[in-house]
Every structure is written in C-alpha cells, then in structure tokens.
From Swiss-Prot:
Oxidoreductase recorded as keyword: no
Name of the protein this chain belongs to: Hydrogenase maturation factor HypA
Record keyword Transferase present: no
Annotated source species: Cereibacter sphaeroides (strain KD131 / KCTC 12085) (Rhodobacter sphaeroides)
GO biological process: protein maturation; protein modification process
C-alpha cells in the first residue's frame, strides 16, 4: 500500500507549512490526483486518517479533486482529454499519443486555523 507513504509525505509538507506560517490545525486538505496516478482513493483516505494522527492535520477533512488524463496527439497536433492511456485521439482517431497529464498528485490548498 503505497498510499501510506504518500500520506507520510503529505504530513511532512503540512508540518513544514504549519511551522512556516504559524497555523495550528488544518480543517480541510484538498488534493488533486490525476487519473493515471495509480492512487487508490479509498486506501488513501484510510491512510490519511491514520498518518495524520498527532499532526496539525489530525481530524482534517480530505477532499480529492480528480484531474483528467491528457495527451498530445502526434497525428493532429492537438491536446485532448483521454480516459485510458491507450485510447485513440478523441479528436482525430489517431493512435500516436503522448500522455502529458493525469499522473500528478499535489496539494491544491488547505483551510487552516
């Protein structure tokens, strides 16, 4: 379950930001997770609750914002949203695509007090 180690990284970022900006608690933490990031959201939610115990984010609500997969089509030169890495271009039907988005995971923002 790599979601546990992802949450440990999030905890480190939260603690660093709490020291830098002087907040005591995180009420809401919003994560953007790309379609191809390979993150199991249910496991991430469970790990988040466990790993955040004793930190500024203990008891925080985790909101996950889904980001679409995106690819550049070498046939038509356009960027398009794709559901699967192996889908053809939805604009021209071409099959020569390079994924350019959808594998990211980042903290979008936090509501703190």
């Amino acid at each position: 379950m790599h979601e546990m180690s992802l949450c440990e990284g999030i905890r480190g970022i939260v603690e660093d930001q709490a020291r830098r900006h002087g907040f005591a608690a995180v009420k809401v933490l919003r994560l953007e997770i790309g379609r191809f990031a390979g993150v199991e959201k249910a496991a991430l939610g469970f790990a988040f609750d466990v790993v955040m115990r004793g930190s500024a984010a203990e008891g925080a609500r985790l909101e996950i914002l889904d980001l679409p997969g995106r690819a550049l089509c070498y046939d038509c030169g356009e960027e398009a949203v794709i559901e699967d890495r192996f889908d053809p271009c939805p604009l021209c039907g071409g099959g020569r695509l390079m994924p350019v988005g959808g594998d990211e995971m980042r903290i979008k923002d936090m509501e703190v007090q």
